Swiss-Prot record:
Tissue-wise expression: Expressed in the brain, subesophageal ganglion and in the retrocerebral complex (mainly corpora cardiaca).
InterPro entries named in the record: Pyrokinin_CS
Protein name in UniProt: Pyrokinin-6
This protein's UniProt keywords: Amidation, Neuropeptide, Secreted
Source organism of the structure: Periplaneta australasiae (Australian cockroach)
Membrane-spanning parts: none
Annotated GO MF terms: neuropeptide hormone activity
Functional note: Myoactive.
A biological-process GO annotation: neuropeptide signaling pathway
Gene Ontology CC annotation, any one: extracellular region
Leucine amide sites (modified residues): 14
Subcellular location: Secreted
Family: Belongs to the pyrokinin family.
Length: 14
């Protein structure tokens, strides 16, 4: 859920 990292939106910071 990182707006600055669109590729990690559904990654470890879900």
């Amino acid at each position: 859920n990182d707006p600055e990292v669109p590729g990690m939106w559904f990654g470890p910071r879900l």
